[in-house]
């Protein structure tokens, strides 16, 4: 368990530095095995990072892009992380990347009503990332591992065999598909992007010890994980 802290004066500088670091990690994977997989988080915070990364000179046709977690909603829904990544990351040079889906294109709300079937689809397409970029909510959640979610224990269980699971946040909308703690820990390069004093305080509490109050704490305190934290004031 360890963390590396990279502070920046503003969000633009942090996003640019994170894009540089992720691009370097992907290039290393390409050099070693000819292909690479990156998992990213959704929300509005990563948009500047997505834009910066999309302009990097990489062999994008041999890079797969997927999600750390997804809302179980149609991919054209306003809350879909898939739609966000397609709009802001899979453009410019990164338009040549291979998309690894979590939710099937064309599946409507009725088709997605069975969450376990939705997870089964995601598992069929899952590829272990070489790098992933996590976010953190003000409640200490990361991916879709939320405090109080009934599936949190399963998502944190090192004995749980699958890399993805269905979660039902108590404090956020939509059923979710999320990478598990062990799938995150199996990723060679783990990045975390946070911004502002409020989230810094939550991060510091999470880094102090593993607690279900802050699910991110299990990543930060995992013996296999070195988490590279990009912080913007």
What does each model-found stretch correspond to?
Residues 112, 143-148, 202-206:
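A short secondary-structure junction signal
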Residues 40-45, 134-138, 195:
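Glycine-rich beta-strand-to-loop/alpha-helix junction loops that act as flexible
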Residues 182, 188-233:
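ATP/nucleoside-binding phosphotransfer catalytic cores, i.e., glycine-rich phosphate-binding loops
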Residues 1-38:
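N-terminal glycine-/serine-/threonine-rich phosphate-binding loop
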Residues 2, 61-133:
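Ligand-binding beta-strand-loop-alpha-helix segment within the catalytic cores
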Residues 52-60, 86, 147-156, 208:
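A glycine- and small-aliphatic-rich helix-loop capping segment at beta-alpha/alpha-beta transitions
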Residues 31-54:
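Glycine-rich N-terminal segment of FAD-binding domains in flavoprotein oxidoreductases
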Residues 138-182:
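Class I SAM-dependent methyltransferase SAM-binding "motif I" and its flanking Rossmann-like core
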């Amino acid at each position: 368990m360890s963390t590396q802290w990279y502070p920046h004066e503003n969000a633009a500088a942090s996003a640019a530095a994170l894009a540089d670091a992720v691009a370097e990690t992907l290039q290393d994977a390409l050099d070693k095995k000819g292909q690479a997989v990156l998992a990213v988080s959704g929300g509005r915070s990563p948009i500047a990072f997505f834009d910066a990364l999309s302009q990097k000179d990489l062999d994008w046709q041999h890079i797969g892009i997927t999600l750390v977690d997804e809302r179980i909603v149609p991919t054209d829904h306003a809350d879909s992380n898939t739609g966000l990544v397609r709009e802001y990351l899979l453009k410019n040079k990164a338009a040549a990347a291979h998309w690894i889906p979590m939710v099937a294109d064309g599946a409507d709300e009725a088709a997605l009503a069975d969450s376990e079937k939705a997870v089964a689809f995601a598992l069929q397409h899952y590829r272990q990332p070489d790098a992933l970029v996590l976010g953190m909510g003000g409640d200490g959640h990361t991916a879709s591992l939320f405090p109080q979610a009934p599936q949190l224990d399963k998502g944190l269980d090192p004995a749980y065999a699958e890399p993805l699971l269905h979660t039902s946040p108590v404090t956020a909308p939509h059923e979710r598909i999320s990478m598990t703690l062990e799938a995150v820990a199996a990723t060679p390069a783990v990045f975390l992007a946070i911004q502002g004093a409020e989230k810094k305080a939550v991060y510091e509490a999470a880094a102090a010890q593993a607690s279900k109050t802050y699910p991110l704490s299990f990543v930060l305190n995992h013996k296999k994980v070195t988490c590279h934290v990009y912080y913007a004031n």
